[in-house]
């Protein structure tokens, strides 16, 4: 016979598994459609027209039209494609289901069009909204927060291909003063995260790790080097934090999302021309290309980091539907490679992992997620103690500092102005 605690944990197990599978399938379908549209826009269509896919006119044209298309979706779709991600945390309150079709279309257009944002925020919003809406009908006695936690855990597992990230994140959010043990509260979310991760693994494997030279033994000087690298990444990230609300306010003075996103897409196109095709899109595949290209110099890595960070700020400020974590990881990789090229005595494993830790910490203000991203991009167990130590001064630097989010004015409606 199972203990009553075990029976309590099992109550939400089946819904948790179902939510994890559904969260992954929604992500997979969206990414497959976006990939097909991306191939059409950036491979087949320019080839048919006899235009180079890295032609400045093509890059500017596609991104400008992408901005206009996303603006039209936000302007005319029911619910205006959900809330502006620049004003929302990664895990937020459920939105009305009527806003989801527009949000999905806006996300697919942005991913395919080369916008420097990832899928994490919109996918999270979609999955939370569906889980709350369907769960409230099927099991009305379960509160909305439980459905929100299960959906967000399933989505995190699906996004990263492992339940580890969900375990780390929810170990801090669910660790309250309740007498219920932490792992009792983590049981159902981890079931959802595991189901999401395993389902994603059936179709594709998220590839985060980079082919960076193995790091052997930690030295005391490496801790200082890592802390300096993280501080540099934090400084770069805080420039973006300062710019985002100001640019967002300036762009939204125009009130018309079609105009705002059209201009935003045009600016992204110019940045894409300067940075080249590797500076476009969400950044995960592109950072693999960046590491594989042995011809890049210190100045090239610096340019890519600056361009990607600027594109991230412009895309978020313009109202494109997307997340900021994946492009931030690209910025961290570019910064890390630049610093290694500048000071070869510091191993690339340290510069890249600590730069990722610093920039993701600025974007998410989540220590566990920052450690996780640094550890999966540069998978080396020798680095883990160093990263944990480097996290301490990095966290001190950011204590009390503003987050990479825009405070929504009180008079502004729940969704974008139209």
Curated annotation (Swiss-Prot):
Keyword Transport in record: yes
Source species, domain of life: Bacteria
Main location: membrane
Protein name as annotated: Putative ion-transport protein YfeO
Family named by the database record: Belongs to the chloride channel (TC 2.A.49) family.
A matching Pfam family: Voltage_CLC
Transmembrane segments: 10-30, 54-74, 99-119, 120-140, 149-169, 186-206, 223-243, 258-278, 300-320, 322-342, 343-363, 371-391
SUPFAM superfamilies: Clc chloride channel (SSF81340)
HAMAP family (alphabetical): CLC_YfeO
GO terms of molecular function: chloride transmembrane transporter activity; monoatomic ion channel activity
Species for this entry: Escherichia coli (strain SE11)
Gene designation per UniProt: yfeO
Membrane topology term: Multi-pass membrane protein
Compartment(s): Cell membrane
Coiled-coil zones: none
Keywords: Cell membrane, Ion channel, Ion transport, Membrane, Transmembrane, Transmembrane helix, Transport
GO cellular component, one term: plasma membrane
Keyword field contains NADP: no
Disulfide cysteine pairs (residue numbers): none
